[in-house]
């Protein structure tokens, strides 16, 4: 009895350099637009003040011009950023473990879902604010989603080993921008 040997095809795909470059560019844009949005707080804080976020914390005696925050409002807004920044760093530990166990695709999906959820919470903060502090919850949800997106993109530095340092620098720069 003879047995024919059937060649086993590799499950890994071979990508062209154009496809690899497209993937790296998309990851950089993804990190730029989604992963580090909480670090633009200095730019958004004046807008939050003008929108009257946490203005209920100000007393009527605070005679401030429009666009200026009272001390309590300013402290609460700073607390918002502090919670977000702390959660970004704490989440990095969790992301590393999940990345090792489930891979970058899984972590990318989680990051996408968290960033979407945080955006929805912040978009509908007026009706939600009566039940919980939707600004902090939405902002922290954005902050937690960022590292899932950012760290899952690191593996793309291996697509072009000769330029791995440059790719990592671009991804890191996109996160902090």
Question: Which role does the model predict for each range below?
Answer:
Residues 1-3:
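Intrinsically disordered, low-complexity cytosolic terminal tails
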Residues 8, 12-20, 35-136:
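First extracellular/luminal loop
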Residues 25-30, 138-141:
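Alpha-helical transmembrane segments of MFS and MFS-like solute carriers/permeases
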Residues 28, 78, 109, 136, ...:
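Conserved glycine-rich helix-kink/hinge and helix-boundary motifs of the Major Facilitator Superfamily
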Residues 32, 79-86, 140, 169-177:
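Transmembrane alpha-helical cores of Major Facilitator Superfamily
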Residues 48, 145-172:
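Intracellular juxtamembrane helix-capping segments at the cytosolic ends
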Residues 130-149:
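Hydrophobic core of transmembrane alpha-helices in multi-pass small-molecule transporters
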């Amino acid at each position: 009895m003879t047995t024919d040997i059937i060649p086993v095809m590799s499950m890994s795909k071979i990508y062209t350099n154009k496809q690899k470059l497209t993937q790296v560019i998309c990851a950089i844009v993804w990190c730029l637009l989604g992963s580090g949005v909480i670090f633009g707080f200095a730019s958004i804080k004046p807008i939050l003040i003008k929108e009257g976020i946490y203005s209920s914390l100000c007393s009527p005696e605070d005679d401030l011009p429009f666009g200026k925050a009272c001390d309590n409002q300013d402290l609460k807004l700073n607390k918002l950023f502090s919670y977000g920044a702390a959660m970004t760093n704490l989440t990095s530990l969790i992301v590393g473990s999940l990345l090792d166990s489930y891979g970058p695709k899984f972590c990318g999906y989680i990051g996408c879902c968290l960033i979407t959820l945080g955006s929805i919470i912040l978009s509908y903060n007026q009706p939600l604010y009566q039940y919980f502090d939707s600004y902090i919850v939405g902002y922290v949800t954005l902050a937690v989603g960022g590292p899932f997106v950012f760290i899952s993109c690191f593996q793309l530095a291996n697509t072009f080993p000769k330029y791995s340092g440059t790719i990592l620098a671009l991804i890191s720069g996109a996160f902090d921008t």
